[in-house]
Amino acid sequence: MSTIKIEKKSQLVKEVFDSVASRYDTMNDIMSLGMHRLWKDKMVNSVHFTKNSKVLDVAGGTGDIAIRVVRKEPSAKVTVCDINQNMLNRGRDKAINSNQINFDWVCASAESLPFEDSEFDYCTIAFGIRNVSDRKKALNEAHRVLKPHGKFICLEFAPMHYQNEIFTKLYDLYSFKVIPKIGSIVAKDKSSYEYLVRSIREFPTQADFKMEIEEVGFKNVEFHNMSYGIVALHIGTK
């Protein structure tokens, strides 16, 4: 299994999401058997969003998290930021179809956010942090734009480490054989889904990622596994 080189990752990620944008939601449903919707629900429901709070959703082009936030707290002011304009376009269309027209949509990198220091009360990122080229820089930026006591909420796939050899082999078979095949059939793009699988496998463990979040200054960092550790929710406070 080849490692994704950092210097090439940014362009690769852009190409991947340019390719899959139009079928991204469909593929998520197929690959996760619809579970991604439950994981996102649990992510948003785990946080008490205060009235009139400012929320930044990074790598949020699909609009999934933003829509859930305003359904939970209608007074929230949500900014959706994504490096990929095609994903933002899809998210904007979805938001309009959900009668959500008051979001701000910003095309920018998680590693260089075009916002003031201490501007937001909450910073969310779902299934996006593993795709940034420089994770520490992205975490520093999230910390910078949050107000004191602001919350960082991150939902991400976790590398699977099971002692059960049979389960591990089945998971690897599904990840490296079935998912790319589905990508080839449904999205006509096998290589993009091979990348997505590799990016999960190369992501740090839950405990190691917790330490990375702490290293940029977040306090009271905790994580909660979902679906037996397939995904994890990390929450930290500035």
From Swiss-Prot:
Reactions catalysed according to its record: a 2-demethylmenaquinol + S-adenosyl-L-methionine = a menaquinol + S-adenosyl-L-homocysteine + H(+); a 2-methoxy-6-(all-trans-polyprenyl)benzene-1,4-diol + S-adenosyl-L-methionine = a 5-methoxy-2-methyl-3-(all-trans-polyprenyl)benzene-1,4-diol + S-adenosyl-L-homocysteine + H(+)
Source taxon at top rank: Bacteria
EC number annotated for this UniProt entry: 2.1.1.163, 2.1.1.201
Pathway named in the protein's UniProt entry: Quinol/quinone metabolism; menaquinone biosynthesis; menaquinol from 1,4-dihydroxy-2-naphthoate: step 2/2; Cofactor biosynthesis; ubiquinone biosynthesis
BP term (GO), one: methylation
Keyword Glycoprotein listed: no
Signal peptide (UniProt feature, chain positions): none
An example molecular function term from Gene Ontology annotations: 2-methoxy-6-polyprenyl-1,4-benzoquinol methyltransferase activity
Binding site for S-adenosyl-L-methionine: 62, 82
Entry-linked InterPro entries: SAM-dependent_MTases_sf (IPR029063), UbiE/COQ5_MeTrFase (IPR004033), UbiE/COQ5_MeTrFase_CS (IPR023576)
Record's keyword annotation contains Ribosomal protein: no
Keyword terms of this UniProt record: Menaquinone biosynthesis, Methyltransferase, S-adenosyl-L-methionine, Transferase, Ubiquinone biosynthesis
Enzyme class per UniProt: transferase
Stated family: Belongs to the class I-like SAM-binding methyltransferase superfamily. MenG/UbiE family.
Functional summary from the UniProt entry: Methyltransferase required for the conversion of demethylmenaquinol (DMKH2) to menaquinol (MKH2) and the conversion of 2-polyprenyl-6-methoxy-1,4-benzoquinol (DDMQH2) to 2-polyprenyl-3-methyl-6-methoxy-1,4-benzoquinol (DMQH2).
Name of the molecule in the record: Ubiquinone/menaquinone biosynthesis C-methyltransferase UbiE
Organism the protein comes from: Wolbachia pipientis wMel
Organism taxonomic ancestry: Bacteria, Pseudomonadati, Pseudomonadota, Alphaproteobacteria, Rickettsiales
